[in-house]
Amino acid sequence: MTTEQFYREIGSDYAAVLERLGAEDMIRRFVLKFLQDPSFSALEEGFAKRDAEVAFRAAHTLKGVCANLGFDRLYAPAAALTEKLRGRAFTEGADALYGEVAQAYRQLIDAIGRIG
């Protein structure tokens, strides 16, 4: 699958990402590099250890990466989770949002794996 097809599959705006990053090879490189991004692992760790500071920082970083790369379906729950954790506490609804982030993350990783 091409990078443009990948963006179509994940429901994101390839043209907007191309305008922001400037070249398809750069987009492809950053998309594939996302597989090595530690933000989601840090988020998992923050939730597992109930460390709201770690979880907040990880959610905030993940949100930013998703905004830059146009990963809209992961950006939305990551942004909501960031706001939920902004007070550095696991408030009501944080666990449910984490579940949404985890599901969107896994779907995105699966789609990235199909880039040819």
Residue ranges and their predicted role:
Residues M1-R57, T61-G116:
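Two-component system phosphorelay core
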